[in-house]
Every structure is written in structure tokens, then in C-alpha cells.
Swiss-Prot record:
Family affiliation: Belongs to the NADPH-dependent sulphite reductase flavoprotein subunit CysJ family. In the N-terminal section; belongs to the flavodoxin family.
Disulphide bridges, residue numbers: none
Cofactor: FAD; FMN
Gene for this chain: cysJ
Protein name as annotated: Sulfite reductase [NADPH] flavoprotein alpha-component
Complex formation: Alpha(8)-beta(8). The alpha component is a flavoprotein, the beta component is a hemoprotein.
Pathway listed: Sulfur metabolism; hydrogen sulfide biosynthesis; hydrogen sulfide from sulfite (NADPH route): step 1/1
Lineage of the species this protein comes from: Bacteria, Pseudomonadati, Pseudomonadota, Gammaproteobacteria, Enterobacterales
Length: 599
């Protein structure tokens, strides 16, 4: 691996030090280099005195701390942009991921900015769960000397819109913190709100924080950014689909696809635990149906991000058509004066239920009206990429990336409907067809750095995807650590995803144990959480041996049920009461021994 070295004048190392560094890292793999980068970042964080060559007295350097609490990457991008704005203003700033934040130091923060998303039913992002729990515990300190601001990202189609940000904002104030600015709650189309908020934060902090010397602002403004790539959410790679294979049986109620995408010579890199972002296009048939229901032609010009496009093209490429929201229902009702929908206006619960059960196209079908093209565009939300847990390791598949896609299919009064991204991959992209993708790195879902560490993987349904990547990596590394998989689905014969591969891993000794839960193969429904309780004694032995626990899948039901089962196992076999078991599991989370990728 070769790296272009910056001019020596820009380096903090002398030529001899640089030569030693290059010699020490010349034969390291990308994964090893990434680990070394994170290691030195940790060393740096533990030695604050080394951050500046000539540190000023603490009273002159209160500094600004930005905590990024991100689930899909959007909050992290906003936090990074704010960090860059503050550095440009020559302010002393530090950006830290919530999962890396030593939250007991929060009492010493003078200027604190929180950028957070929300997941599930109003829960904080995975990396912020421990911080959230600490702030809401009896251990939380008073924050009378802390001024703070919160930017909250969410999706108004969900009931608990921006709840995590609301929680942080109210709790920081309750603990005595002073609001620099009122909290901002941003919807899916958050960019404009974020840009305005960042400018206000910079203005507010200029009067609070001293301007730092360049060496100080650069040093303390550093952040653990080990991933560099020319491809991103806003500049995706045009890759090609090479395999689209249905991996559920013909009689299964589920349509699950194994998708392989060829990355070519792009150099795009990922690690087990990362997600693949997929930009999709809406079904042309769905676009045609919606346009005709509104008595439009499809060639009407509309403005999208400053460009003029035909309506059909705009709807296919730029707007969300397969997810309805309470706001869309309410706005459509108001625009059209629909006798069916107007009674729902003002009743949040009824609006959300209607949106959850009635796609946009069927809302228009059931409550027909005539809208002009611009009115339709203004009603809709921008199309956003979907994220899929990566189901492969480049140690085995090299220039490919695999994902496991559960295709969303359902009927509305006899008319077939489907999910936007899942049906795009399953039905509309031909072999070798183009798929625009990017990697969403997830450092909060990583294999242990020590290959001897045991691993417990809990992933029912398509939640099995990242564990396929984990096993490919552990096999390639010849990691001696034990591996235990818990998997569940409705039927053994129809829904055992990647069955042959798991059987091979068991035979080869890579997979030490596998416990399977088939919920519909017997009268009594059995789920993975039941298997956890059944194997409680052995599970506790693995935990005592230092095992790392990973959970992937549904956030609203499965993940909560699994966590409850883990708490029961810890309490019973660890001889703890409920409160102590909860504290024990929280400590595992802080130690990165309990990680979740839930959605």
C-alpha cells in the first residue's frame, strides 16, 4: 500500500521519525492501518497535555466539545461540518463520537454541542445509548457551568420525531445547563436547517470561546477519521449488479435476495460491520400510475434543486413515493379539501395510522383530486438512499460487496405494492445493470481487535447479514476465538438463509455453536430470545470468558426482546438483581462488548 507523503514543511515529524513510521507500517493491511490509526487516537486522547506544543492555561482554553450521535451517518456529517466551520473561525474545538465520549467528564464541559439522530421508537442512536442512560440516571452531575446547543435529526413519518434530541435538550437544561440556542428539529431534508443552525452556532460561540492559535485549533480539532474515499452519499460509485439470487424457498412468505455488486477497480473499501448505501429509482409503472391519477401528463416541467426536469423524471429519480407520512396526508387533505381525509387533520394518531397503511398512490386513488405538477412536487419528500448491512468481507470477496435484501411486498385492495429500494434491486436492475452505491462506515459494530476473543452473534431474519461478513473475516484471519450464532426465521425448510455456508463453517470448526429458532414449525412460537434463555448457563460462561455480543435486526421488537433476555440471563446466572444486571449490560456496552446494528 503506498501513500503520498505531504511536503516535509507540513509534517510535524522530522525525516528520521518519518522514515521509522513508514518502515513500521509498510506491510500493514488497510484494516491494520485503520486499527493503528484508532490506537494512536486513543493514546492522544489519554494525553491531553500533548495536544498543543505550548498549551495555554486552562482558564484561557475552555474549548468547545461537539458530541456526534449518529445512526445512519447524517448526524455525523452535520457534526463534522460544524467542526470545520468552528476551526475556520479559529475556535478551539474537539469532535467526538458519542460512543467514545467519556461521559463522566461532562461536568467539566463549558461549551457543549450535541448533534443527534433518533432510531426505533424514540431511542437514541446505538453509539449514544450509554451517554443517554447516564444523563438520565442518578449519577448525572449538575451542569451549572455548561452552555449547550442541540441539533436533532429525525423523520416526521415516525411517531417519536426527533425524540432523542428532545431528550438530550431537556435533560441538559434540567441538570442546570444554559441553552446557547433553542433546539432545532430537522426532518429528512435537513441540509438547509443544518446550514442555518451551524452559522448561528458559530456566531454564538465566537463571543464565548477564545480564538485559538492555529496549532491549538488544529490539534484539538482532530477527530478519528480513518476512512477516505472519493465516493460518498453525495458522490456515489456507479457499480454493477452481478448476482441477484432468491435465498428463501418457493413456499416462503418472505422474498429474501442475496445481492452481489461488483465494485470494479474503484478501490472502494469497507469492513465487516459497515453498511452499503444504495441510491434507487422509483418504479416507472408507479410513477405513471400516480401521474395519471392526478390527471397529469408527465412531461410538465418542474424545478428540482435549481434544475428544470420533466415531471416523470423528477418523480422517478428525486422523490420518495413508497413511504407516506402524516405530514403528506395532512397537506394533501388541506390542498384537496378531501372529505375523506379532512376529518383526520389535527388527530396525530389517526394521521400516522393512515400514512402507515396507505401508500401515497393509494391515498390519491381513494381521495382523487387534480394537482398541478409543482404542487405535487412540493407535497413530496426527497428520495433518500437505503442502507443495508454488508454481508461480506473483502478478505474473501475482494472487489465485491454483498447484501441481504428482504423485499417488501404487500397488497392494497388487490393491487401489488413494493418497497422502493428492495424492489429496485430485486426486480428492476438487470444483471450488470448500474447501481449507485457508497459505504456508510460503522465503527460501533466491529469485530474484536483480539482474534482470540469469543463472539456471540444474534441475528434473526436479514439480521444475519453482518454475521456472514464476520465469519468470512474470522475464517480469513484464522482467528482462534470461538463463534456462536443465534438465528431465527419462520420455517427451517423455507427460511434458513445461507444454510449451506453455516453448515460448512460448523464442519470446519469456524462456527463453534449455532442455535436456531423456527417460529412457525411447531405450535408454540420459538424466537431467538427463547434460545438465549434456554442456553443461559453457557451464555453466561462465554460472557465471563470475555465474549463480545452482537445483535442485528429489527429495533422495535426483536432487539428489545433480546436485550430483556440477556438481562434475565445476567441476573439469574450472575446472581444479580435487576438494577445490577442493567448496570452490568451497560458496562458491556461502554466496553464495546455489547454492540447492536438495529433498524
Amino acid at each position: 500500500m503506498t501513500t503520498q507523503v505531504p511536503p516535509s514543511a507540513l509534517l510535524p515529524l522530522n525525516p528520521e521519525q518519518l522514515a521509522r513510521l513508514q518502515a513500521a507500517t509498510t506491510d500493514l493491511t488497510p484494516t491494520q492501518l485503520a486499527w493503528v490509526s484508532g490506537y494512536f487516537w486513543g493514546v492522544l486522547n489519554q494525553q491531553p497535555a500533548a495536544l498543543a506544543a505550548t498549551p495555554a492555561p486552562a482558564a484561557e482554553m475552555p474549548g468547545i466539545t461537539i458530541i456526534s450521535a449518529s445512526q445512519t451517518g447524517n448526524a455525523r456529517r452535520v457534526a463534522e461540518a460544524l467542526r470545520d466551520d468552528l476551526l475556520a473561525a479559529k475556535l478551539n474545538v474537539k469532535l467526538v463520537n458519542a460512543g467514545d465520549y467519556k461521559f463522566k467528564q461532562i461536568a467539566s464541559e463549558k461549551l457543549l454541542i450535541v448533534v443527534t439522530s433518533t432510531q426505533g421508537e424514540g431511542e437514541p442512536p446505538e453509539e449514544a445509548v450509554a451517554l443517554h442512560k447516564f444523563l438520565f440516571s442518578k449519577k448525572a452531575p449538575k451542569l451549572e457551568n455548561t452552555a449547550f446547543a442541540v441539533f436533532s435529526l429525525g423523520d416526521s413519518s415516525y411517531e417519536f420525531f426527533c425524540q432523542s434530541g428532545k431528550d438530550f435538550d431537556s435533560k441538559l437544561a434540567e441538570l442546570g445547563g444554559e441553552r446557547l440556542l433553542d433546539r432545532v428539529d430537522a426532518d429528512v431534508e435537513y441540509q438547509a436547517a443544518a446550514s442555518e443552525w451551524r452559522a448561528r452556532v458559530v456566531d454564538a460561540l465566537k463571543s464565548r470561546a477564545p480564538v485559538a492559535a492555529p496549532s491549538q485549533s488544529v490539534a484539538t480539532g482532530a477527530v478519528n477519521e480513518i476512512h477516505t474515499s472519493p465516493y460518498s452519499k453525495d458522490a456515489p460509485l456507479a457499480a454493477s449488479l452481478s448476482v441477484n439470487q432468491k435465498i428463501t424457498g418457493r413456499n416462503s412468505e418472505k422474498d429474501v435476495r442475496h445481492i452481489e455488486i461488483d465494485l470494479g477497480d474503484s478501490g472502494l473499501r469497507y469492513q465487516p460491520g459497515d453498511a452499503l448505501g444504495v441510491w434507487y429509482q422509483n418504479d416507472p409503472a408507479l410513477v405513471k400510475e400516480l401521474v395519471e391519477l392526478l390527471w397529469l401528463k408527465g412531461d410538465e416541467p418542474v424545478t428540482v434543486e435549481g434544475k428544470t426536469l420533466p415531471l416523470n423524471e423528477a418523480l422517478q429519480w428525486h422523490f420518495e413515493l413508497t413511504v407516506n407520512t402524516a405530514n403528506i396526508v395532512e397537506n394533501y387533505a388541506t390542498l384537496t379539501r378531501s372529505e375523506t381525509l379532512l376529518p383526520l387533520v389535527g388527530d396525530k394518531a389517526k394521521l400516522q395510522h393512515y400514512a402507515a397503511t396507505t401508500p401515497i398512490v393509494d391515498m390519491v386513488r381513494f381521495s382523487p383530486a387534480q394537482l398541478d405538477a409543482e404542487a405535487l412536487i412540493n407535497l413530496l419528500r426527497p428520495l433518500t438512499p437505503r442502507l443495508y448491512s454488508i454481508a461480506s468481507s473483502q478478505a474473501e470477496v475482494e472487489n465485491e460487496v454483498h447484501v441481504t435484501v428482504g423485499v417488501v411486498r404487500y397488497d392494497v385492495e388487490g393491487r401489488a405494492r413494493a418497497g422502493g429500494a428492495s424492489s429496485f434491486l430485486a426486480d428492476r436492475v438487470e444483471e450488470e445493470g448500474e447501481v449507485r452505491v457508497f459505504i456508510e462506515h460503522n465503527d460501533n459494530f466491529r469485530l474484536p481487535t483480539n482474534p482470540e476473543t469469543p463472539v456471540i452473534m444474534i441475528g434473526p431474519g436479514t439480521g444475519i447479514a453482518p454475521f456472514r461478513a464476520f465469519m468470512q473475516q474470522r475464517a480469513a484471519d484464522e482467528a482462534p476465538g470461538k463463534n456462536w450464532l443465534f438465528f431465527g426465521n419462520p420455517h427451517f425448510t423455507e427460511d434458513f438463509l445461507y444454510q449451506v455456508e453455516w453448515q460448512r463453517y460448523v464442519k470446519e470448526g469456524v462456527l463453534t455453536r449455532i442455535d436456531l429458532a423456527w417460529s412457525r414449525d411447531q405450535k408454540e412460537k420459538i424466537y431467538v430470545q427463547d434460545k438465549l434463555r434456554e442456553q443461559g448457563a453457557e451464555l453466561w460462561r462465554w460472557i465471563n470468558d470475555g465474549a463480545h455480543i452482537y445483535v442485528c435486526g429489527d429495533a422495535n421488537r426483536m432487539a428489545k426482546d433480546v436485550e430483556q433476555a440477556l438481562l434475565e440471563v445476567i441476573a439469574e446466572f450472575g446472581g444479580m438483581d435487576t438494577e445490577a444486571a442493567d448496570e452490568f449490560l451497560s458496562e458491556l456496552r461502554v466496553e464495546r462488548r455489547y454492540q447492536r446494528d438495529v433498524y
